[in-house]
């Protein structure tokens, strides 16, 4: 850590309680009060260094020559800083460091200790040392932290802006090229001037060891010790100098985890847990609301996992509505990057549902709206025998990914007995039909919901099944649906019909290929030898499809026969009851 020694005399003061006395033996002729501290001093050393003290002493002097009493309660830095100022005026040895130079510079300005009142006065000396401090990352961090104590004076003297600019330059520079002398987080605030911290401007330590850097995140920990207002100014300056938005986002995330420890309760075991203080929930809430506005606004820069965790913490802390809406909008715009487990947000409101489905619905609607405005539509695809076949571009478009995510989310929340049918349908219907190449996911979610809500009416079952397109079910899903007793009979018949139609089309196509393969005119030389095994495979496949088709026809006939038998039985039973009711009493069967 940089330092500068001023003065040459030995200690000339001693303290008695809250009073400082001079040991020179001369009687004090001026008493200066700073807060609850009293300094019994002499006029001449003060008059020769401070313009303010010169005026105050002249105004307070009496004709009888008695000592005067002055009050300097507004001096920057308080009694501790004025103690150093007093020693400087008396020529006693003091040491300027990154921890005291800012308050001394502000106090010197307040006391008007310019070179007009003696060469090498405190204003000039502290200004010279500040320029040295600004050349060093660790010292600049320490100095910026102390600005909090004298914020107004430091602002007027442009100390904060100069310090922030120097830090921004170093953070944006390549440390491997410039060898900025960086320190480690805790050492930056400990105030210990260890041997390892004694280094030159180029980063070479006094012991001959080169300071090590750990990549682009080397400055995150040091910056996290700043107060939120100063951290915001540093991030703004760094962003203005063109740092990558991804690095800025990571720095803000690091700061958030440190100052909003409630977020760390949701950290997975494989994630780094940052040691944090224990601020109040109100302080955490204030910090979170400020952080939301500090995050880069560009889509995809902030990890969706972090945004979802931040949103959940905002709900716990009852953050402002604008902050939560901001987070929901950010998450919605990049919902395709979310993981299912992170969407399972516990319900913090008055609703009876286990999860906050209203919040997720708003984010889905935001995503659909943003993609439609951008004109993003999934590439066309073909569904052949229940399997996706690519046609051109990759099918994993953002909209398709979100459709899969939403179907998985519906399957997770469907077992909640308090989840209303209307809300389930609203979430499923929020995804446009073109976003689902297959409807297997939404079918699975519907099946889970029907299983968890067996009391819903037949009309409601019919209504919820309209969310899926039976033509877009895979072969496996169709087979399951055809045997699913929870589905309405109309839906089962529809599934069987479309599956039979699909199989018939496939069989016709395979027969066409088989006939061409059997034609000897199409087999010549080596090509005939290659096509013969293929023809055998085609015949086997055709045989399998015919068997599957016959099985489905039999299942369909069984369902229809069962339904007809039940109707005939019911009709006969009703006819028998009516016949018995219509018999005359005198024709009743006599008792045996």
Curated annotation (Swiss-Prot):
Domain BTB positions: 28-98
Alphabetical list of Gene3D superfamilies matching this protein: Potassium Channel Kv1.1, Chain A
Domain NPH3 residues, every copy: 217-502
One GO biological process term: protein ubiquitination
Keyword Repressor on entry: no
Keywords: Phosphoprotein, Ubl conjugation pathway
Record CDD domains: BTB_POZ_NPY3-like (cd18312)
Family per record: Belongs to the NPH3 family.
Function: May act as a substrate-specific adapter of an E3 ubiquitin-protein ligase complex (CUL3-RBX1-BTB) which mediates the ubiquitination and subsequent proteasomal degradation of target proteins.
Domain remarks in the Swiss-Prot or TrEMBL record: The BTB/POZ domain mediates the interaction with some component of ubiquitin ligase complexes.
Name this protein carries in UniProt: BTB/POZ domain-containing protein At5g03250
């Amino acid at each position: 850590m940089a330092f500068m020694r001023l003065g040459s005399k030995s200690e000339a003061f001693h303290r008695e309680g809250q009073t400082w006395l001079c040991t020179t033996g001369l009687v004090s002729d001026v008493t200066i009060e700073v807060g609850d501290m009293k300094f019994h001093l002499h006029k001449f050393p003060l008059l020769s260094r401070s313009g303010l003290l010169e005026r105050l002493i002249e105004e307070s002097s009496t004709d009888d020559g008695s000592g005067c009493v002055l009050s300097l309660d507004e001096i920057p830095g308080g009694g501790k800083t004025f103690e150093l100022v007093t020693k400087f005026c008396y020529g006693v040895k003091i040491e300027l460091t990154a921890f005291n130079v800012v308050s001394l510079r502000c106090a010197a300005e307040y006391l008007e200790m310019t070179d007009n009142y003696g060469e090498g006065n405190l204003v000039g000396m502290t200004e010279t040392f500040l320029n040295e401090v600004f050349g060093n990352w660790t010292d600049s961090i320490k100095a910026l932290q102390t600005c909090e104590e004298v914020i107004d004076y430091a602002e007027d003297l442009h100390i904060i802006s100069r310090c922030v600019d120097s830090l921004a330059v170093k953070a944006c520079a390549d440390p491997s090229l410039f060898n900025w002398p960086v320190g480690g987080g805790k050492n930056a605030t400990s105030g210990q001037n260890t041997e390892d911290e004694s280094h030159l401007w180029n980063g070479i330590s006094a012991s001959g060891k080169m300071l090590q850097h750990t990549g682009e995140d080397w400055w995150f920990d040091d910056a996290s010790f700043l107060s939120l207002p100063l951290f915001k100014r540093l991030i703004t300056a760094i962003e203005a100098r063109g740092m990558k938005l991804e690095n800025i986002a990571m720095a803000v995330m690091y700061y958030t985890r440190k100052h909003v420890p409630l977020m760390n309760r949701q950290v997975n075991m494989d994630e780094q847990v940052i040691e944090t203080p224990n601020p109040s929930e109100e302080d955490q809430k204030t910090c979170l609301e400020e952080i939301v506005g500090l995050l880069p606004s560009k889509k995809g820069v902030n990890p969706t996992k972090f945004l979802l965790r931040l949103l959940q913490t905002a709900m716990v802390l009852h953050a402002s509505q604008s902050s939560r809406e901001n987070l929901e909008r950010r998450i919605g715009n990049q919902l395709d990057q979310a993981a299912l487990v992170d969407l399972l947000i516990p319900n913090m409101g008055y609703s009876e549902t286990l999860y906050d489905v209203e919040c997720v619905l708003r984010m889905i609607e935001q995503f659909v709206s943003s993609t439609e405005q951008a004109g993003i539509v999934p590439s066309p695809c073909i569904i052949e025998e229940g399997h996706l076949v690519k046609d051109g571009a990759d099918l994993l478009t953002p909209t398709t990914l979100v459709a899969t995510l939403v179907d998985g989310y519906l399957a997770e929340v469907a077992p909640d007995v308090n989840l209303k049918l209307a809300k389930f349908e609203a979430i499923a219907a929020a995804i446009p039909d073109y976003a689902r190449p297959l409807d297997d996911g939404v079918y699975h979610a519907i099946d889970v919901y029907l299983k968890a809500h067996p009391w819903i009416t037949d009309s409601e079952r019919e209504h919820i099944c309209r969310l899926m397109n039976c033509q877009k079910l895979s072969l496996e899903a169709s087979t399951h649906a055809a045997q699913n007793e929870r589905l309405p009979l109309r839906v089962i018949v529809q599934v069987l019909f479309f599956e039979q139609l699909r199989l018939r089309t496939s069989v016709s196509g395979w027969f066409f290929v088989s006939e061409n393969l059997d034609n000897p005119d199409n087999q010549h030389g080596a090509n005939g030898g290659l096509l013969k095994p293929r023809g055998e495979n085609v015949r086997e496949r055709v045989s399998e499809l015919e068997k599957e088709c016959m099985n489905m026809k039999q299942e369909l006939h069984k369902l229809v026969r069962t339904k007809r038998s039940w109707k005939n039985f019911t009709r006969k039973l009703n006819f028998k009851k009516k016949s018995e009711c219509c018999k005359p009493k005198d024709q009743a069967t006599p008792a045996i």
